[in-house]
Amino acid sequence: MKPVHAFMRLYFIAGTQDCLHLDGDPAQNLLNILQQALQSGITCYQFREKGKKALQDPDKIKALAIQCRDLCRQYQVPFVVNDDVQLAIDIGADGIHVGQTDMAVADVAALCHSHCFIGTSVNTLEQGIAAQANPLIDYFGTGPIFPTQSKEDPKPVVGVDFVSTIRAHGIDKPIVAIGGVTTQTAEELRRRGANGVAVISAITQSADIAKTVKELLGNAQ
């Protein structure tokens, strides 16, 4: 597997709750969007089935996650599970992403037995310093950079300067910038030190996924 920083160039996150604006079955819509995104060049995908409008049946969630995993494997793109460590283990995910209020990273690592790379979310400089010092954390998502409607409980906006601040404090682990990122802002975030950007609605709501992915990758292609 490539170094983790190579996967961060364009990190796509989505679940069925992000596909409700489309007609038809949300699960099938997610699979269709994911396949188009993979064909177009995303470098990592995180299965994030979360919130009141997401699937609630564990069996349906697992079945859909397996379909997403299999699509990612066809394109040799890492498949990451958000928060649900047991699901990640059960279906052989490549990575697991946990927030500050999810399972402790040490517990995640103990369960995964080094089979998954581990990412976490960072919203403050103090969290970034702690993530840098924790050898179990392979990368972290910083944000939200801009206001976002994709999450039900978004943290305070940190702005583009936060990425520069993180780097200025000697934090050199792979960083993916997330939260309201668009084709107009992705390159600026990379210039400030992010290894890449993570998006939800920029792709799920795109009328031309191939074009959007190309623009989000920009000079990182």
Swiss-Prot record:
Domain of life: Bacteria
Residues engaged in binding 2-[(2R,5Z)-2-carboxy-4-methylthiazol-5(2H)-ylidene]ethyl phosphate: 148-150, 180, 200-201
Top EC class, one word: transferase
Keywords: Magnesium, Metal-binding, Thiamine biosynthesis, Transferase
Note on how the cofactor is bound: Binds 1 Mg(2+) ion per subunit.
Cofactor: Mg(2+)
A GO-annotated cellular component: cytoplasm
BP term (GO), one: thiamine diphosphate biosynthetic process
CDD domains, sorted: TMP_TenI
Gene Ontology molecular function: any one: magnesium ion binding
Pathway the protein acts in: Cofactor biosynthesis; thiamine diphosphate biosynthesis; thiamine phosphate from 4-amino-2-methyl-5-diphosphomethylpyrimidine and 4-methyl-5-(2-phosphoethyl)-thiazole: step 1/1
Residue numbers binding 4-amino-2-methyl-5-(diphosphooxymethyl)pyrimidine: 46-50, 82, 121, 151
Residues forming coiled coils: none
Reaction catalysis annotation: 2-[(2R,5Z)-2-carboxy-4-methylthiazol-5(2H)-ylidene]ethyl phosphate + 4-amino-2-methyl-5-(diphosphooxymethyl)pyrimidine + 2 H(+) = thiamine phosphate + CO2 + diphosphate; 2-(2-carboxy-4-methylthiazol-5-yl)ethyl phosphate + 4-amino-2-methyl-5-(diphosphooxymethyl)pyrimidine + 2 H(+) = thiamine phosphate + CO2 + diphosphate; 4-methyl-5-(2-phosphooxyethyl)-thiazole + 4-amino-2-methyl-5-(diphosphooxymethyl)pyrimidine + H(+) = thiamine phosphate + diphosphate
Residue numbers binding Mg(2+): 83, 102
Enzyme nomenclature, EC number: 2.5.1.3
Protein's job: Condenses 4-methyl-5-(beta-hydroxyethyl)thiazole monophosphate (THZ-P) and 2-methyl-4-amino-5-hydroxymethyl pyrimidine pyrophosphate (HMP-PP) to form thiamine monophosphate (TMP).
Family, per entry: Belongs to the thiamine-phosphate synthase family.
Name assigned to this protein: Thiamine-phosphate synthase
Annotated source species: Pasteurella multocida (strain Pm70)
Lineage of the organism: Bacteria, Pseudomonadati, Pseudomonadota, Gammaproteobacteria, Pasteurellales
Gene expressing this chain: thiE
